[in-house]
Amino acid sequence: MDNLDIFENACKYFLEKMTEFKEILSSKVNSLNNQDWILSKGSTKTCKADETGKKKRCKVGLNYGLKIELSVADVDIILNEFSSFFTKTYVENIERISNNEEIARYEFLARSSIGDEIRCTIYLANEWNIPQISLSGFVAPRYKKSDY
């Protein structure tokens, strides 16, 4: 595994894991097979300089998105795959956020001990939602390779 304390390595790792998970979903959920997901590579934000003058960076807006109608059965498959896949990665703390499930909005979160996150959000079709699935990532602040 790469040294994930380095910003560039962590960004590459999380994008690779999100891509790998998207491919798994495409093979497990029929309606996601052969779909063209939209990728956003996000943007880098720079934190305030520390006492040595070095600045940590974080990555926000890593995202795969797809407007597609899914079923509750699909959501169950996705949750199982999400839990199974991400517990074997650096973001092993898995949480299901069930506050909005009564309005057909499902959210699963994988988080690391230092604040990295990968989130899967699913909106099922109804009067409040545009049906879609989104995988988004956040890389917590780290120093660039050149700062070591």
Predicted features along the sequence, with ranges:
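Mitochondrial intermembrane space
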Residues: 11, 29, 38, 58-59, ...
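Long, charged/polar, surface-exposed segments that mediate recognition or autoinhibition
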Residues: 53-105
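Non-cytosolic coordination micro-motifs
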Residues: 112-114, 123-148
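Ser/Thr-rich, low-complexity intrinsically disordered terminal regions
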Residues: 34-49, 94-118
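Broad gene-expression machinery/nucleic-acid interaction feature
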Residues: 61, 117, 132
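N-terminal leader/targeting segments
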Residues: 1-55
